[in-house]
């Protein structure tokens, strides 16, 4: 099976003719159209994408097979996935979120902190959510070189230098 990466989500219908409001997770939002066809997470549906215009909160787009507002509304919240081999290779110091999720995270002394469970981007930069055995709560860690000096995808590990935790 082809490995896929989440590249966007449908935020809802736009207009009355089946157009959708698309939220792109790609570094250049318009690049999402170049990765067509895009698939639903379960892989049961695929869409070719034609971007129509910028809209508040994303991009207006036409999806193949979506002709009415009702069909577009039914897709609200659906994530869109691209074949991994269609995505560009990244420089050495950049990573796809999908590659980081599940990696073990160790502090600079070698103690296991947990695993990356999720990654959030609220505009100011990525935040790693780390959870593991013995943790009472998740550790939210800015994904910057200061806090995460080493990412070794081949070894499946991250070395982090988190701030002191407050009790």
Swiss-Prot record:
Localization of this protein: Cytoplasm
InterPro entries: PRC_barrel-like_sf, PRC_RimM, RimM, RimM_N, RimM_N_sf, Transl_B-barrel_sf
Record GO cellular component, one term: ribosome
Biological process annotations from GO: ribosomal small subunit biogenesis; rRNA processing
A molecular-function term among this protein's GO annotations: ribosome binding
Protein's UniProt keywords contain rRNA processing: yes
Database matches in Pfam families: PRC_RimM, RimM
PRC barrel domain location: 92-166
Alphabetically ordered keywords of this record: Chaperone, Cytoplasm, Ribosome biogenesis, rRNA processing
Protein purpose: An accessory protein needed during the final step in the assembly of 30S ribosomal subunit, possibly for assembly of the head region. Essential for efficient processing of 16S rRNA. May be needed both before and after RbfA during the maturation of 16S rRNA. It has affinity for free ribosomal 30S subunits but not for 70S ribosomes.
Subunit details: Binds ribosomal protein uS19.
Comment, domains: The PRC barrel domain binds ribosomal protein uS19.
Stated family: Belongs to the RimM family.
Protein name: Ribosome maturation factor RimM
Name of the gene this protein is made from: rimM
